[in-house]
Structures are given as C-alpha cells and as structure tokens.
C-alpha cells in the first residue's frame, strides 16, 4: 500500500515538474534538491543499490531521479506520521472526533477529501483544535495536494490515499502507551522506509537501543 501511494506521488511529481506552471511545486522541490545536493555524495554503485530498495519509479529526468525519490519518500513519511498522530490524539479522547481517518474515508468526493487533508492535516486544523499549535509546520511536504488540480492525477491520487486510509483504519491506536522500554515506533518506521545507505549519505546515524541503555546504566 505504501509503495503504491509513493508511486502515485512520484507520478504526480514527475508530471508537475514536466509541465508549464506549477511554480509552487517546482520551487519546493528545487529547495529540497538543493539541500539534498549539499548533503549527499553518492557513487553510481550506491545509487543503484538505493534505487533498488525504494520500490517505485520516477518518470522525470534521470538527473534528479534520486532526490525526487527521496522527496517522495519523505512526503509519504510526513503524511503518514500526521495521520498516525491524529489517530493517537483521537483514540485517547483528546479530540471531538473519535477518528480522523474514518471521517476522511466517509467523504464522498475527491475534492472534499483533498480539501479536508489540506485544512485538517497539512494546515494543522485538527491539531490546532485540540491545542497542539505548531504541530504541523513543514509546508514543503504538502505539495501533493497542489498536484491534484489535474483530474486524472486527482483521481488516482485519491484512490491511493483512500487505500492507505483503509489500511490504517484496521489498527488500534488506543493501545499505544508510553513505557520505559517501549520501542520508538516512528523512528523504526523511518529507518525501514529510507534505505540505510541513503540515510548515512545524508549524515543520519542512530544509536542502537542496547548502546543507549548501556550508556544510561
């Protein structure tokens, strides 16, 4: 499900970058690509290995293939984390809604779904309503909503989003508790999503749990 959604994101990004207009998306991606270019210096062999592990294609120029895929990957990660955070908040009785995901799934039109994602998730409306002001700040990863102005892209994107929402709806978020030895679920998810070689090229290194516990003890 996640790979299928990232493929839709990748298709939308390639289309937006290849067509006239779309200045906002091009600007956001340009900023991202510049930052990525400053951080990553990969060999051809490393690029092949990373591309093979991502699991989706990019139909745009080969020169921006890897930064585009990383942009897509982080967009997916950003949206998923916001949705999970909203469900945790709702599941613990902190919101008037019992599930934002179910509310999104109940929306009948693609246009309504896009608008709800924009206002409640990407603009932080859901979180602001429960007092979590400033929880959502990185507007750079909301670009996918602006890419849905074209009907064909909107239709396929919304189908992929609904599939993702349906998959998330089967999980129980009220069982997530903070315990001293609980694993960092979001950290583990991110490490599984972004290939290790790519994370290291960006200067991202994580201390193993056993070493942290040993150091603290």
Residue ranges and their predicted role:
Residues 1-151, 205-208, 212-217:
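Charged, often flexible domain-edge or linker segments that flank or initiate folded functional domains
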Residues 137-216:
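Class I S-adenosyl-L-methionine
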């Amino acid at each position: 499900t996640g790979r299928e959604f990232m493929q839709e994101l990748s298709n939308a990004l390639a289309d937006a970058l290849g067509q006239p207009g779309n200045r906002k998306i091009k600007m956001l991606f340009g900023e991202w690509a510049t930052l990525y270019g400053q951080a990553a210096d990969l060999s051809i062999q490393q690029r092949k290995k990373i591309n093979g592990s991502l699991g989706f294609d990019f139909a745009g120029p080969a020169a921006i293939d890897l930064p585009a895929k990383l942009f897509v990957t982080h967009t997916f990660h950003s949206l998923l984390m916001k949705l999970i955070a909203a469900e945790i908040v709702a599941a613990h009785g902190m919101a008037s809604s019992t599930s934002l995901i179910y509310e999104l799934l109940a929306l009948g039109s693609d246009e309504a779904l896009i608008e709800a994602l924009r206002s409640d998730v990407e603009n932080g409306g859901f979180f602001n309503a429960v007092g979590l002001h400033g929880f959502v700040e990185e507007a750079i990863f909301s670009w996918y909503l602006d890419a849905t102005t074209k009907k064909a892209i909107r239709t396929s994107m919304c189908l992929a989003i609904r599939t993702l929402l349906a998959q998330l709806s089967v999980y129980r978020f009220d069982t997530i508790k903070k315990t001293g030895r609980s694993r960092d679920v979001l950290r583990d998810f991110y490490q599984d999503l972004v290939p290790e070689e790519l994370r290291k090229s960006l200067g991202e290194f994580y201390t193993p749990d056993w070493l942290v516990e040993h150091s603290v003890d």
